[in-house]
From Swiss-Prot:
Short sequence motif 'HIGH' region: positions: 43-53
Enzyme class (EC, first level): ligase
Name of this chain's protein: Valine--tRNA ligase
Protein encoded by which gene: valS
Source organism: Xylella fastidiosa (strain Temecula1 / ATCC 700964)
Subunit field text: Monomer.
Molecular function in Gene Ontology: aminoacyl-tRNA deacylase activity; ATP binding; valine-tRNA ligase activity
Family under the similarity heading: Belongs to the class-I aminoacyl-tRNA synthetase family. ValS type 1 subfamily.
Keywords: Aminoacyl-tRNA synthetase, ATP-binding, Coiled coil, Cytoplasm, Ligase, Nucleotide-binding, Protein biosynthesis
NCBIfam families, sorted: PRK05729.1, valS
Bias type Low complexity, positions: 333-353
Chain ranges for the short sequence motif 'KMSKS' region as given in the UniProt record: 585-589
Domain of life: Bacteria
EC number(s) recorded for this UniProt protein: 6.1.1.9
KW Glycoprotein (keyword) present: no
Length: 994
């Protein structure tokens, strides 16, 4: 047991306690009790702990600690994800900083992968060290890396099985393409950013001298224009892809163009003839109602192209530059039928059968970057009189979340998983309740995604990751197997047949979908037995954000069901997303990221600025970010400790909403920890030398552990606090079951701060200092008992301070155990408080009395040390009994000189008044304050505040201000008005009192 210090300093014990817990093996599954399993969403191995991690991991840790204390066999499975793209970027950047001239390409595939493994050994466990600092009580001996041998074997097995079942195929389709990374990326890695752009109107001449009568109308239906035209005006935001157009499109019911459907136009700059088609996808009111169709460079156009069997012409290469020549491909999606399992398939059906004539691009455009090409194409169009107009236009621009580059829809050969049958089963499992969403409204999001699912692109053009287990021969046939040896044996391929493994790797979500069962040894029977596959699958709950319900949650449900016949988890608890205090998403580019460790351990202003401005994708933002940081944190961030951060997170964890993280809340909960520390010091000082530690003062619990003897209260205050303890214990269990961490934190905070620290500690003082030795002894025991129980209730949320304090309190109750984290969680049935109802009601009445009189003191600015008189009038018999019963407590708590009763007919002197039920409380003013001076002061202050309210109302009634000022400024003014109004009401109340 450590030396108990006089002040709360989390740095003095948090790291020490964690090391003791881990060394003792307290985080490992016990192997007895009901299994309770949580899967940690594996963070990127490249990453550091961010607020989203801290938020979810705090809630997971609270659940694990709670169930561990409830006697469950808890397994918290942790690990890290290999993070293909992110890791390649980090290692490449590090090589550049080393200045040796090494690059990914100069090292080659094998050399670069070796470099990644070196980096992983040196830096890959950073995030796990940070998780320990937060207090994560996971079994680190089972920590898994997605590139470890066991998960890698699971990935290969899953790929081969799905391929053999016809669920995996290789085909030519449109994907998200990052032209800097030169790889396909997932939708989750694309951020759609609203930006200001242009909408260009381009003239596409009708072929063969065709003309039409163009008519326009205003909103009222009046004809505003009638003219004969020989071309269609096409509106586009991407003129650089014009070279790949294979049609122009109108709405079938747009009367302006119905006569032209089936005709052709001449594609500008190329002379190619393309058809005018109709499709309901067109919005007639957008631009001119005529749009170009470029199936190889737009996702919507791609779908149109498939519906109309349009050819697809790819005009950009993998770096988003104009190609010199290209092939016209048929508008039939490749991979539409599954490959057979015993016969090798064509490696790329689209290359074999979907390609036709070769097109030569204009020589002066070939090799140009897409934006340089845009400028040149617009200039060429203008020179030919084909550029009609350019108007400002707001559009959603897809940007890669890592490079910031505009993502290209890119037609390329990739591997895909057929999702239709898998999704139908995944939806069925949720609909029938095999998997429960909390809150339940997220089922609607899940259902929408599953009912509109597309085939999943699983290949990535990277080196780091699980290499696709497919081999090509020199004829382009593909063979899939667990190894090259298996492929050769299965297909009788001799050594004379050259096989080359596919260069691509699987995207990280492919391995992540297997996480629930690959971490339990699948598919190796021996590993499954060793790691508890049957015992720990399904897991109990998945805690995750709504942004990956489809990308991860749905895929785990589908894959786990398909490969194991089980669900991956029973509950999915969906959390909100952590945002900054203004509600903005935290991001490096915004410069508003908060590092949880900086909140825990503190950081200087200079270090904080350096952290926020180093390694920016857009260095030009550094000055702006530094300025904002210095304004928000002029003194840096003070250390708060892990517990203050954890309690803040729990208190903010409302269901399914975005979470605004305000550092001021963390400061408030640091004060809460300090309050708990000081209350414990008070209890320990007032129970020193007490006999509660003797064997007669404790008893064996049902689990065999020694538990403190239940108090036999002798005072009303003891009976009240014990009844409140039973109630808050029941509520804690209910809120854990409902995943309402916010309500749990609120209930425990209210009990600890208000009821135990503020009320019971104060109510205990008369008994502790009184002449009744039995009441004093009973009160000391109850203080210890309630505090020890409270520490157990709080432990899942704030484990460090509760452990440190409990180690001081437990011996006073005769408890021999050495750690709080393995103690039983309090149960409400352990306290029978029915007999305490009357005493509890009396104390609640006392609290109302004391609060009312304290408000009078505050209103009149009476110093705390100044004694006051109390006159009572009216009331019931029960009020008289309670006044007599609590006379000592009232004198002690309120600094009363005397208490007198007035008859109903006696005129009361000038007094401040409060009402409790039918009882009138009067505090005589004579000699207490200078009434005339206080009236004058209040009148002056009331006028000042009324003036401020008038100013604020003037601003908010000004429509120009409300409509044009930034939203934050308007809201700030409304907040000021609310504050001034509250202040005015208080001033008027005090004035009325006088």
């Amino acid at each position: 047991m450590s030396q108990f210090t006089s002040s709360y300093d989390p740095t003095s014990f948090e790291a020490r306690l964690y090391a003791e817990w881990e060394a003792a093996g307290h985080f490992k599954p016990s192997g007895v009790g009901q299994p309770y399993t949580i899967l940690l969403p594996p963070p990127n191995v490249t990453g550091t702990l961010h607020m989203g991690h801290a938020f979810q991991q705090t809630l997971m840790d609270a659940l694990v600690r709670y169930h561990r204390m409830c006697g469950d066999d808890t397994l918290w499975q942790v690990g890290t994800d290999h993070a293909g793209i992110a890791t390649e970027m980090v290692v490449s950047r590090n090589m550049a900083l080393e200045g040796r001239g090494e690059t990914r390409d100069s090292l080659g595939r094998e050399g670069f992968i070796n470099k990644v493994w070196e980096w992983k050994q040196q830096s890959g466990d950073t995030i796990e060290r940070q998780m320990r600092r937060l207090g994560v009580s996971a079994d680190w001996s089972r920590s898994t890396f997605t590139m470890d041998a066991q998960p890698s074997a699971a990935v290969t097995e899953a790929f081969v099985r799905w391929y053999e079942e016809g669920l995996i195929y290789r085909g030519q389709r449109l994907v998200n393409w990052d032209p800097v990374l030169k790889t396909a990326i997932s939708d989750l890695e694309v951020e759609n950013v609203q930006e200001e752009g242009m909408l260009w109107s381009i003239r596409y001449p009708l072929s063969d001298g065709v003309t039409y009568e163009h008519i326009e109308h205003d909103a009222a239906g009046n004809e505003t224009l009638r003219e004969t035209r020989d071309s269609l005006i096409v509106a586009t935001t991407r003129p650089e892809t014009l070279l790949g157009d294979t049609a122009v499109m109108v709405h079938p019911e747009d009367r302006r163009y119905t006569a032209l459907i089936g005709k052709t136009v001449t594609l500008p700059l190329t002379g190619r003839q393309i058809e005018v088609i109709s499709d309901t996808y067109v919005e007639p009111t957008f631009g001119t109602g005529v749009v170009k169709v470029t199936p190889a460079h737009d996702f919507n156009d791609y779908q149109v192209g498939l519906r109309h069997r349009l050819p697809m012409i790819q005009v950009l290469d993998d770096a988003a530059c104009i190609v010199s020549k290209t092939s016209i491909q048929s508008g039939i999606a490749s991979g539409a039928t599954s490959d057979t399992t015993d016969t090798p398939s064509d490696s790329d059906a689209s290359n074999a059968s979907n390609q036709h004539d070769t097109l030569i691009m204009p020589a002066h455009l070939a090799g140009l970057d897409r934006y340089e090409a845009r400028k040149q194409i617009l200039a060429d169009l203008d020179a030919q009189g084909l550029l009609v107009a350019a108007t400002p236009h707001t559009l959603q621009v897809p940007r890669g979340d890592r490079t910031g580059q505009v993502i290209e829809p890119y037609l390329t050969a990739q591997w895909f998983v057929r999702m239709e049958t898998l999704a139908a089963r995944g939806l069925e499992l949720v609909e029938r309740g095999a998997v429960r969403f909390v809150p339940p409204n997220w089922i609607n999001t899940y259902r929408h995604w599953m009912e509109n699912i597309q085939d999943w692109c699983i290949s990535r053009q990277l080196w780091w990751g699980h290499r696709i287990p497919a081999w090509f021969d020199t004829q382009g046939c593909v063979y899939v197997g667990r190894s090259e040896a298996e492929v050769r044996a299965k297909h009788a391929l001799g050594p004379e047949v050259t096989l080359t493994q596919d260069n691509d790797v699987l995207e990280t979500w492919f391995s992540s979908q297997l996480w629930p069962f690959s971490t339990l040894g699948w598919p190796d029977p021996m590993a499954m037995a060793e790691r508890g596959f049957e015992r720990y699958l399904p897991s109990s709950v998945l805690v995750t954000g709504f942004d990956i319900i489809f990308f991860w949650v749905a895929r785990m449900i589908m894959a786990t069901d398909h490969f194991t016949g089980n669900v991956p988890f029973h509950d999915v608890y969906i959390t909100g997303l952590i945002r900054d205090a203004q509600g903005q998403k935290m991001s490096k580019s915004k410069g508003n990221v908060l590092d949880p460790l900086d909140i825990i351990d503190g950081i200087t202003l200079d270090d904080l600025v350096a952290k926020r401005t180093t390694g920016l994708m857009q260095p030009k933002l550094a000055e702006k970010i530094a300025k904002a940081t210095r304004k928000e944190f002029p003194d840096g961030i003070a250390p708060h400790g892990a517990d203050a951060l954890r309690f803040t997170i729990a208190a903010l964890a409302t269901h399914g909403r975005d979470i605004k993280f305000d550092l001021g809340r963390a400061e408030g909960y640091k004060n809460f920890c300090n309050k708990l520390w000081n209350a414990t010091r008070f209890v320990l000082m007032n129970t020193a030398g007490d006999t509660a530690h003797s064997p007669a003062q404790h008893q064996a619990g049902q689990d065999g552990q020694d538990v403190p003897r239940t108090p036999q209260p002798r005072t009303d205050a003891e009976q009240w606090i014990l009844s409140r303890l039973a109630a808050v214990t029941a509520e804690a269990h209910a809120q854990f079951a409902a995943y309402r961490f916010d309500l749990l934190a609120q209930a425990l905070y209210e009990f600890a701060w208000n009821e135990f620290c503020d009320w019971f500690v104060e109510l205990a003082k008369p008994a502790l200092n009184g002449d009744d030795t039995q009441a004093a002894a009973s009160t000391r025991h109850t203080l210890l008992y309630v505090l020890e129980t409270l520490l157990r209730l709080l432990h899942p949320l704030i484990p460090f301070i509760t452990e440190e304090l409990w180690c001081q309190v437990a011996p006073r109750l005769g408890i021999q155990a050495t750690t709080l984290m393995l103690r039983p969680y309090p149960q409400p049935q352990q306290l029978e408080t029915t007999a305490f109802a009357n005493a509890a009601a009396d104390v609640e009445w006392l609290k109302i009395m004391v609060s009312a009189l304290r408000r009078i003191r505050s209103t009149l600015n009476v110093p705390p040390s100044r004694r006051i008189s109390l006159l009572l009038q009216g009331g019931q018999e029960v009020d008289r009994r309670r006044i007599t019963h609590f006379a000592i407590a009232l004198h002690f708590l309120l600094k009363l000189e005397h208490i007198d009763w007035l008859s109903a007919t006696t005129a009361a002197p000038p007094s401040a008044t409060a009402i409790v039920g039918s009882l009138k409380l009067l505090v005589p003013l004579e000699g207490l304050i200078d009434v005339d001076a206080e009236r004058a002061r209040l009148d002056k202050e009331i006028k000042r505040v009324e003036s401020e309210i008038d100013k604020s109302n003037g601003k908010l009634s000004n429509a120009v201000f409300v409509q044009n000022a930034p939203t934050a400024v308007v809201e700030q003014e409304r907040s000021r008005l609310r504050e001034w109004t509250t202040q005015l009401n208080g001033l008027r109340e005090r004035r009325t009192t006088l």
